[in-house]
């Protein structure tokens, strides 16, 4: 699975259970890449 800060596909997210696939705020957004971020819980 994809760990924190790993690129992911918003349609087929493969992030680990502790992470979620989100659109970056700031860097990276202009080329449509999503990244795995640690869940807020």
Curated annotation (Swiss-Prot):
It is found in: Secreted. GO terms for cellular component: extracellular region. Keywords: Disulfide bond, Knottin, Neurotoxin, Secreted, Toxin. Disulfide bonds join 1-16, 8-21, 15-36. Coiled coil: none annotated. Its main location: secreted. GO terms for molecular function: sodium channel inhibitor activity; toxin activity. It comes from the Eukaryota. Expressed by the venom gland. Toxin that causes irreversible contractile paralysis in adult Aedes aegypti resulting in 100% mortality after 24 hours. Belongs to the neurotoxin 14 (magi-1) family. 08 (Ltx-4) subfamily. The presence of a 'disulfide through disulfide knot' structurally defines this protein as a knottin. This is U-theraphotoxin-Lk1a. The lineage of its organism: Eukaryota, Metazoa, Ecdysozoa, Arthropoda, Chelicerata.
């Amino acid at each position: 699975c994809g760990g924190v800060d790993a690129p992911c596909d918003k349609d087929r997210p493969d992030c680990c259970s502790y992470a979620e696939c989100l659109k970056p705020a700031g860097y990276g957004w202009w080329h449509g890449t999503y990244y795995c971020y640690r869940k807020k819980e």
